[in-house]
Each structure stands twice: as C-alpha cells, then as structure tokens.
Amino acid sequence: MTIMMVAALLAGAGLAQAQWERIEKNMPLALAEELAAAAVADCQAKGYAVTATVVDRAGLVKVMHRADGAGPHTIDASRRKAYTSASARNNTTAMMENSQKNPGAQNLGQIDGFLMLGGGMPVRAGNEVIGAIGVGGAPAGHLDDQCAQAALDKVKDRLK
C-alpha cells in the first residue's frame, strides 16, 4: 500500500511539473544576422540606404546592420519597428492602418518604444513568433516592408 501511495504521489508531482513547463523556440544569432544582412542588401539593390534590426521574442536587439550612407535616425526607427512588431506579434503596417480606423487603437503609438510605421514584421517559426525584423530608411514604409519581406522570404524554408 505504501509503495502505491508513493508511486501515485511521484506520478502526480511529475504531472504538475509538466503543466508548468513551456518550451519556446528562439531565434539563433546566425538567423538574425542573415535576416538583417538580406534586408539591407535588398534595399541597397533598390537604391535605399537603410538600417535593419532584428530582435528576439522579448524585443531585445539580436543584431543591427546599418548600410553605408543610412541616416542616423534609421537606427532608432528600425529598432522601434522591430520592437513594436515583436511585442504585438503583428506587422507594423497593419497596426498603423488599424490605429487609423479604430479609435480604441489610436493610442498604441504612445506606448514607450512603439513606432507604428511600415517596416516591422514578426519572424515566425511555424505559428510561433520568435522575434521580429525592423527596417528603416527607405523613402516610405511600404518600401521598408518590401525589404523586410524579402529577407523573410530568403529564410522561410528554415522557419517551419
């Protein structure tokens, strides 16, 4: 009887522990480097000097690439776009458009660190957001989006 009670208690303890565990995918540094380099290269090919920042799931900077000739403002813009996208798990263009249509979302831009302009996109491994990329410096947000999307397309086979 005592052995069965101990076995039941141990099994229950293992089950309780398993309920509290969470396994998360994280972005490797090599992937962050590749994303930032690909975004800058895509924009350079189009004649835009940009900065690309890649953040982890918590919005902390993993990597930043700044093209020769990119303005100093692009550093903060790309970082804030990446942070916004990682935090909200959405692309910043969609957030900007939503805030323009939805009065309840208009103050999202007041959150510290947020920048709701095009150029920020989440990086997903399957359905899980593992970080985000932010691009700043092209003449318009939709052009920053294109460079970020080109970088994501380049690595999409490894994000399943």
Which stretches of residues belong to each language-model region?
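Bacterial N-terminal signal peptides
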Residues: T2-A13
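Long, non-catalytic terminal segments
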Residues: M1-T2, I23
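Flexible, solvent-exposed loop/hinge segments and secondary-structure transition points
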Residues: Q17-K160
